Amino acid sequence: MQSQTNPNPSLPDDLILSCVARVSRLYYPALSLVSKSFRSLIASPELYKTRSLLDRTESCLYILYCTSNTWHEGPRLRVKLMSCTACVLDEKIYVSGRCKDGDSMTFQVFDTNTQTWDPLSVPCSETKHDFHYKIVRFDGKLHLVSYKGVDAYNSKEGRWDLVTPSIEHNKYLYDCYRNIGNVWYTIVKGDISTSVWWYHSEEREWRDLKGMVGLPKFPIDACLRMVDYGGKMAVLWDDYLPGRRKKMIWCAEIALERRGSLEIWGKVEWFAHVLTVPRQYEFVKVLAATL
């Protein structure tokens, strides 16, 4: 009697990993439904390390249609970017980033109505050595930050205007920003102390957030993130444990009170260590969720 052969012999894990790494990330949600092993593979860091080694990294735009609750891949950027920053203004997505050659930057605009990308000229020509590519949206305009100053983009007139010269714009260069109650806040780390600032839109200047008694000094290399927590300010930051093999995530909750038109006070209600993670983790974004 002839023995029956297995019609679906298993493939080596390394071969499966190599094959999946060559597939667009758009199809990963579907692949994760195939089996538990595929689901584990899609979630594994080894997959993304392999994609990087094979030069299969992607700069993709995924669009969620809320009516059908489905994801679709949008048109790709016309240039490959090493890193980027983005924001939304007037139903358009503005993306600024460093090109893959590492020596130039680009500005691209995605029109959500026409589903197309278009280049946008920038008011500076800095290279990777002196350009801090950050875009921030407030006062109804797009603000482009460079070491030479801050330029605001008027989308209706298609014009850039210098709003802050380089000597006055240091508050824009920090990564921790959040709009809380229609007011922009940022945190400035220093060797001696940490300060929180808010932007007075009418006076067009940054002002010190008063109070803040009990706010701990953040490590100079800490990654900071801020979020609107029901009208209060929640600040999260990290700090290494001894040995630097793990990090502690800390959180502080700060109540905000406006006193007149020129002062805002902050009261630190509590802060505590809330989580321990491996040192390899990175803060990406902080969201306040209501369950």
Curated annotation (Swiss-Prot):
SUPFAM superfamilies: F-box domain, Kelch motif
Pfam families for the chain: F-box (PF00646), Kelch_FKB95 (PF25210)
Top-rank taxon: Eukaryota
Protein name per the record: F-box/kelch-repeat protein At5g38670
Gene3D superfamilies the record matches: Kelch-type beta propeller
Kelch repeat ranges, renumbered to this chain: 46-91, 92-140, 142-187, 189-232
UniProt domain F-box: residue ranges: 5-51
Keywords: Kelch repeat, Repeat
PANTHER family in alphabetical order: F-BOX/KELCH-REPEAT PROTEIN SKIP4 (PTHR24414), GALACTOSE OXIDASE_KELCH REPEAT SUPERFAMILY PROTEIN (PTHR24414:SF184)
Record's keyword annotation contains Transcription regulation: no
